[in-house]
């Protein structure tokens, strides 16, 4: 209870334990946009692997039929993260988007190839800098998530995905 916190710890309590209003935004789902759909709950652990595969393939089928829907960078980030976790996506959806190999900085790719996990994570932190992850452009978020996928640090990746993908209100 906030009333029981000593006066010299009230700021700490409100920022870290009590929760500040800016961090307590709830997720609003928009099932018309892939990366804002209920499927993002997979990264909370709220979705069975078989169920996410089935639902994602249904969703991609709708997208393929709808010529007006263009996959955004965040949609691609979402799909690539699921693929990294071993989620099977039907081959008929492979042509929905293209990935450029040049999107990963060479120095980070070299660290990943040499299994220098700590160095690669520090480099990612350096890229993020003092910015909030929500404020970073989609291309940079893509390469950060791609790095975390390759390093198999899913816990960190999932927390970042839940910050950047869903619509917060």
Question: Model-found features: residue ranges?
Answer:
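Non-catalytic terminal/accessory regions
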Residues: 1-169
């Amino acid at each position: 209870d906030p009333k029981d916190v000593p006066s010299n710890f009230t700021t700490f309590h409100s920022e870290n334990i009590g929760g500040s209003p800016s961090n307590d935004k709830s997720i609003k789902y928009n099932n018309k946009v892939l990366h804002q759909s209920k499927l993002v709950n997979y990264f909370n652990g709220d979705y069975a692997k078989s169920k996410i595969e089935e639902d994602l393939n249904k969703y991609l089928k709708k997208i393929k039929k709808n010529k007006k829907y263009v996959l955004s960078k965040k949609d691609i980030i979402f799909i690539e993260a699921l693929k990294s976790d071993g989620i099977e996506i039907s081959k008929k959806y492979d042509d929905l988007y293209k990935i450029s190999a040049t999107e990963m900085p060479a120095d980070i790719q070299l660290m990943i190839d040499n299994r220098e996990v700590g160095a690669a994570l520090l480099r990612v932190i350096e890229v993020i800098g003092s910015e909030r992850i929500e404020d970073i452009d989609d291309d940079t978020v893509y390469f950060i998530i791609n790095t975390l996928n390759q390093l198999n640090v899913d816990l960190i990746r999932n927390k970042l995905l839940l910050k950047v993908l869903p619509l917060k209100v």
